[in-house]
Every structure is written in structure tokens, then in C-alpha cells.
Regions:
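Small beta-barrel nucleic-acid-binding modules, primarily SNase/OB-fold domains
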Residues: 2-10, 15-159
Length: 159
């Protein structure tokens, strides 16, 4: 009987603990750069690092432009956030979606397709994201206007 109570308690505890596989509505309150934002959800401020992408650093060519594009797209808007884990800087890694009456925008993908971010090097084999990046390259969108662009991971390594 004691074992049964313990098992029931354990199962309930697991379901009551917050998880990093969360999906929630939030308002974007600050854009830090082209791949990091602050959102507010239920009076909590949460720092989100957009999954799958790596935007130019602010001091890099196109860094400010990338931030401005993201700002225009999502600042002060209500969004859906899907998070799955945290990075080494304790930021929530997540997907951000804007749902309007007639469309849904996957913000992470929009940053790649518009030429405002690279596919993060871990996800280079994702065919959907690769097609978006190739579209931006072929059409010389955003950072692909120039041929000598430096990927953010190379820029950070060489600083």
C-alpha cells in the first residue's frame, strides 16, 4: 500500500513540475539582437534565443539590420513560444510564431528566408531550413547581398 502511494505521488509530482517543452502565449517586450528577445508571459520575463538560427552579431556587418528586421516583425506583438531546453547562457531555446487572422508566421524561418540569419551550424542538414537559406542566397536577400559575409560563429571565434 505504501509503495502504491509513493508511485501515485511520484507520477503526480512529475506532471506538476514545469518542463522545458512548454508552449505558451507571450508578448515580445524587447529585441536584443537578430536571434534573442525578451518576452512577457503571465508576469514572467523570459529570455528567448531563437532556435535553428544564428544572426550576425551587432558589431558585425548586417548585425543592426538583422536586429531591426526582427524588431519590426515582432516587437510589442503577441506571439506563441515553443521552448524545449536552455542553452549554456540560461536562455530558453525556442520557436516563435505570430498568428494573424489570415496567416501564421514562423519567425525563426522568416529570419533565414529574409537573409537576416544563417541556419545555426548544428542544423545545417535540415532540408527545410537549407532551402530557405538557399532561397535567400540565390535572391541576394539581406546579408547575402555581399559575397564576403562572415558567419557569426567565425566572427565570434576570430574576435
Amino acid at each position: 500500500m505504501l509503495l502504491k502511494r509513493y508511485l501515485i505521488f511520484s507520477v503526480l509530482l512529475v506532471f506538476c513540475l514545469p518542463s522545458y517543452g512548454d508552449q505558451y502565449e507571450a508578448k515580445v517586450i524587447k529585441v536584443i539582437d537578430g536571434d534573442t528577445v525578451w518576452v512577457k508571459s503571465e508576469n514572467k520575463h523570459i529570455k528567448i534565443r531563437l532556435s535553428y538560427i544564428d544572426a550576425p552579431e551587432l558589431k558585425q556587418t548586417f548585425g543592426i539590420r538583422s536586429k531591426n528586421f526582427l524588431t519590426e516583425l515582432i516587437l510589442d506583438k503577441n506571439v506563441q513560444v515553443n521552448t524545449n531546453k536552455k542553452d549554456r547562457y540560461n536562455r530558453h531555446l525556442g520557436e516563435i510564431y505570430i498568428h494573424n487572422s489570415n496567416e501564421s508566421i514562423f519567425v525563426n524561418a522568416k529570419m533565414i528566408k529574409s537573409g537576416n540569419a544563417w541556419i545555426y551550424k548544428t542544423y545545417r542538414d535540415n532540408s527545410y531550413l537549407k532551402n530557405l537559406e538557399n532561397h535567400a542566397r540565390i535572391n541576394k536577400k539581406g546579408l547575402w547581398e555581399k559575397q564576403d559575409v562572415v558567419a557569426p560563429w567565425d566572427y565570434r571565434r576570430n574576435k
